[in-house]
Amino acid sequence: MAEEYVPVDPINITPASSKSWLDVDLDTYIASLPPNVTGVAIRVLNASSGGCPAGVRKDGSTDARTTNVTSGQMCFFCGVSSSKIFEIYSGSTTYITAYIVGYFKDVTFLTNATDVSSAKAGVWNDLDSGYNNAIGLILETNIASLKSFDFGFRKNGSTDNRTERGVRRCGCFIIGADAGVSEQYISSTDQDTYLVGYITENATFYTNATDISLGSTGSYADLSVGSASAKANLIEVVASSTYDFGLRRNGASDDLYEGAAKHACILVGADSSGVSEGKIANTVVDFFLLGYFLAAAGAVALAGQIATKSGLAAGTS
């Protein structure tokens, strides 16, 4: 089988209880999943004005990164078990909402993430995953304290220099790699990075990201296309202040519109022409196209939401 990312329009999986790890079964929410599903993409929104605990992990993992996530929205990526189960943690049923926005087939996810934190602050450093065949790395940021630090990720050899502040944890990033090597920047060694998984095919990662920022506010507008064949677009969100933004498949009706976490990475579905839409509350919110995901050879590219099962909640592990 071949690696592939399959986007879906958002499916609400907000936990009904808080402060414990809960099992989520993908088969409960998405019909007719193939047996080679290995991971999931989750959009997490924190509507509080401050931090709130949240986290996701592969079923069976002992990882327990549940420190406060930033106010705003972000993406998390994690593996699923052979039964297509992952686990989610929420510190609040009032402020935290979570949505499945896609799943991965045959992509490698680690049961327990590997610490790939940098020992040097204030400079760009190589981040060697140890997987020479990787063209993209799936990384999770983690700040153990309630402080804010500048950080950034880029493909090895890039001259990009986006090191906007991360206010507490900012979810996961997917970044291009050259023979398994990316680069990271931190302003403090209190900022940790964990390797969650890696990608080897059917994705394109730019060496230098393309600026696809919007010039108008308040309504959804088409974003510049990286490829008409793209099934999903990988977008880095950078903002000098906290303003709302939304990203969705072109033609979709969902409206996950929440504050920019100053620095986030969103994997968003595209229509049959590779187009996604964005909305911003202020032009200080910028979008950068890091790359895009393609259908596996012989696969049928579907624009729009696949068959889902609605009205169901996550169960307690």
Give short role names for the model-derived ranges.
Residues 68-82, 164-178, 258-271, 309:
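Beta-sandwich interaction modules
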Residues 101-111, 197-212, 293-297:
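Extracellular polysaccharide-targeting segments
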Residues 40, 78-94, 137, 174-190, ...:
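Noncatalytic modules at the cell exterior or secretory-pathway interfaces
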Residues 6, 60-68, 110-112, 158-165, ...:
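Surface-exposed loop/edge segments in extracytoplasmic proteins
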Residues 8-36, 48-49, 111-132, 206-229, ...:
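Surface-exposed ligand/attachment interfaces on beta-rich extracellular proteins
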